[in-house]
Structures are given as C-alpha cells and as structure tokens.
C-alpha cells in the first residue's frame, strides 16, 4: 500500500487547487451529500461553532452554508492557499466570524473546542491514526455534538490499484464504527460506488492529476512505463467506446455520547 507523504500531498493539492472544482465532480457530489446528512442530523439549522477539517477548495463549506446558518466557522487544511478559498466563500454567505488553521490536523497542538459540529470531506483517508483522531474530536465536541465525514472505500480507483499495486488502505464502515467505539453513537452510515467513463486511459490520468493527489506513487513515469500502463488499462477496463474508473464513496455521521463528556482535547 502507498505510504503517506504529507509534503507531497500538500504540494500536489496546492498545484491543482484553483482548478480543482472543475474536475473533482465526484468530490463535489460528496460535499452535497455530506452536507445533507449533517443538516438532517441537527435539530435546527442554526449552528454556533463548526470546525471543518480538510477544507480544500471550500466546496463542502459552500454546501454547508447553503443549508445552515453558522455563527463561528473554523476551517483547517494542510495547504495554506486554502485560506483564501474558505475566506471568500464564508464572506459570500455573510459569516460574521471565520478562522483558518493552517497545518496537518494530526500535528496541530491546539484545535477549537466547545464545538457543535465537526465535518471533514474526503480527508480522513489521509490520516495515520484514525482512532486517535476520533478520540481527539470527541474532546473538542460538546455532548451531543456531531462528527460527520466522507471518505473512500476499498474499491476506490480499483483499476489503478490492479495495474500498479499501489493505493491507500481504506477502512470499512464497520471498522470505522468500531474505532469510534463508545465515544459516539451512529446516526448515519452510507456507501456508494460510481463508475466514470473516459475516452481513454490518457483521460483517466489527466483526471487523477487534476484532482490533486492521485492513487499512484512518486516513481518517474518513463515513456515505456506510460505506454505499458495505457495498453494494459485499455485491455483490462474498456467500457463502451472508452474506459472506466471506479469511485467508492463512504459517509459517516456520529453523535458524541453524553458518557464521553469527560474526554479531553487540547483546544484553543
């Protein structure tokens, strides 16, 4: 499986950030679906304090603010250029107070506390200690607060994995529920598979590149390796007049249990 290189992740996302939403149509669909789940889990559309982790191009920010009125919006990302994206979107929606926290969420010494909602769109697959993340977020949430996130499943980009033997390790819904343990109760868990059709393997590679971080490793793409990949992809994954690429999307919505009120986190 692919080893996480967060410096490389930051560089690749940073290079593609401003054109991301034009190509990341699955991620945009995920943002809308996750925002719907969050909205459905809340008793009111009025939210006091919300923290978004992995804000990226602010597609989820925009989707949430179309559904909720949020008094205090905190956002975090590994890529510092995301600050401008989230500030633009929150200003357009009239958010009075927004704050951006730059850096790796697993390395930040302080995070916001007394939160009503924590959300994360297509980010937790990059975390190295998911159980630790769940525990720390429970410490930052109010009792009854919501932790909701989208991620990907084991069939995600299975075509790339089959040909290159690289890719992230994805957890199942059951595994993530077990990691959350007794800190949370589940209010919703869903998964979907999407097959995208492309004109050819070259178009698949362009799509993956333009969505920032791809499922391929950092090895150099020589002409011979590129040609072999194109030929193998076309033979193995033809679909109609082109080729296919699979996305396996997953959604979790947890509510902090009152019994976990004593969990602590380093909060600002």
UniProtKB/Swiss-Prot annotation:
GO terms for molecular function: carboxyl-O-methyltransferase activity; malonyl-CoA methyltransferase activity; S-adenosylmethionine-dependent methyltransferase activity. Pathway: Cofactor biosynthesis; biotin biosynthesis. It catalyses: malonyl-[ACP] + S-adenosyl-L-methionine = malonyl-[ACP] methyl ester + S-adenosyl-L-homocysteine. The keyword S-adenosyl-L-methionine applies. Keywords: Biotin biosynthesis, Methyltransferase, S-adenosyl-L-methionine, Transferase. Its EC number is 2.1.1.197. CDD domains: AdoMet_MTases. It holds the Pfam family Methyltransf_11. PANTHER family: TRANS-ACONITATE 2-METHYLTRANSFERASE, TRANS-ACONITATE 2-METHYLTRANSFERASE-RELATED. Converts the free carboxyl group of a malonyl-thioester to its methyl ester by transfer of a methyl group from S-adenosyl-L-methionine (SAM). It allows to synthesize pimeloyl-ACP via the fatty acid synthetic pathway. This is Malonyl-[acyl-carrier protein] O-methyltransferase. It comes from Prosthecochloris aestuarii (strain DSM 271 / SK 413).
């Amino acid at each position: 499986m692919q080893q996480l290189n967060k410096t490389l992740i930051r560089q690749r996302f940073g290079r593609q950030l401003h054109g991301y939403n034009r190509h990341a149509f699955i991620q945009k669909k995920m943002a809308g679906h996750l925002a719907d789940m969050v909205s459905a889990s809340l008793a009111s559309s009025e939210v006091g304090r919300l923290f978004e982790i992995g804000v990226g191009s602010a597609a989820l920010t925009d989707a949430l603010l179309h559904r909720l009125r949020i008094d205090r919006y905190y956002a975090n990302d590994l890529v510092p250029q995301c600050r401008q994206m989230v500030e633009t979107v929150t200003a357009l929606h009239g958010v009075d107070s927004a704050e951006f926290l730059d850096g790796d969420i697993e390395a930040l010494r302080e995070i916001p506390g007394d939160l009503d909602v924590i959300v994360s769109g297509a980010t937790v697959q990059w975390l190295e200690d998911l159980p630790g993340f769940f525990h720390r977020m429970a410490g930052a949430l109010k009792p009854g607060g919501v932790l909701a996130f989208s991620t990907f499943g084991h069939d995600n980009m299975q075509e790339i994995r089959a040909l290159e033997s690289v890719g992230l390790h994805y957890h199942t819904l059951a595994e993530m529920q077990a990691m959350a343990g007794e800190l949370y109760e589940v209010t919703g868990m869903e998964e979907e598979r999407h097959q995208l059709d492309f004109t050819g393997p070259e178009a698949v590679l362009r799509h993956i590149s333009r969505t920032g971080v791809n499922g391929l490793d950092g090895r150099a793409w020589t002409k011979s390796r590129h040609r072999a990949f194109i030929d193998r992809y076309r033979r193995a994954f033809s679909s109609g007049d082109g080729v296919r690429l699979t996305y396996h999307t997953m959604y979790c919505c947890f509510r902090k249990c009152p019994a976990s009120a004593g969990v602590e986190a380093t909060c600002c």
